[in-house]
Curated annotation (Swiss-Prot):
This is Nucleotide-binding protein XAC3671. One of its GO terms (cellular component) is cytosol. Pfam families: DUF520. Belongs to the YajQ family. InterPro entries: DUF520, UPF0234-like_C, UPF0234_N, YajQ-like_sf. GO terms for molecular function: nucleotide binding. Keywords: Nucleotide-binding. The keyword Isomerase does not apply. It comes from Xanthomonas axonopodis pv. citri (strain 306).
């Protein structure tokens, strides 16, 4: 039976490149000259932003978003934490979401059932496996999920016929 997997993943290599480019842009921008501002990537899951002030953190967030979009990374996978300010400066943690959470996977399954397509969906950890008797049904399911607006980026892989 034909099947495919629905996943929500971020290419770690592209993420590293985007963070490096954002740091390079900080080094060349006039409004960040002589300022201790940095992006740091931890384990490919968390991006730490640090700068002297809250205002500069907001500017850095715009730079990060632009660099991620330029590298083809959907910014819906980012979860911005609160800005922590003290006398030494400001910090913000940006979490990169990987995988489909249980609640969101149930929403995807409900969307497929609601459309009454001849496909079955099952949740496998942080991904969703969709199977059907015909390839056309699977292609309709992919089109439906692409058209629907979920708060996370979806990729379709492991298409088997």
């Amino acid at each position: 039976m034909p099947s495919f997997d629905v996943v929500s993943e971020v290419d770690k290599h592209e993420l590293t490149n985007a963070v490096d480019q954002a740091n390079r842009e900080l080094d060349t921008r006039f409004d960040f000259k002589g300022v201790e501002a940095r992006f740091e990537l931890e384990d490919g899951k968390v991006i730490n932003q640090s700068a002297p002030s809250d205002f500069q953190i907001k500017q850095m967030t715009d730079i990060l978003r632009a660099r991620l979009l330029a590298r083809g990374i959907d910014i819906r996978c980012l979860e911005f934490g609160d800005v922590e300010t003290n006398l030494a400066g400001a910090r913000q943690k940006v979490t990169v979401k990987q995988g489909i959470e249980q609640k969101q996977a149930k929403q995807l399954v409900a969307k497929l059932k609601e459309a009454k397509l001849k496909v079955e969906a099952q949740i496998n950890g942080d991904k969703l496996r969709v199977t059907g008797k015909k390839r056309d049904d699977l292609q309709d399911a992919i089109a439906l999920l692409k058209k629907a607006d979920f708060e996370l980026p979806l990729q379709f892989d492991n298409f088997r016929d």
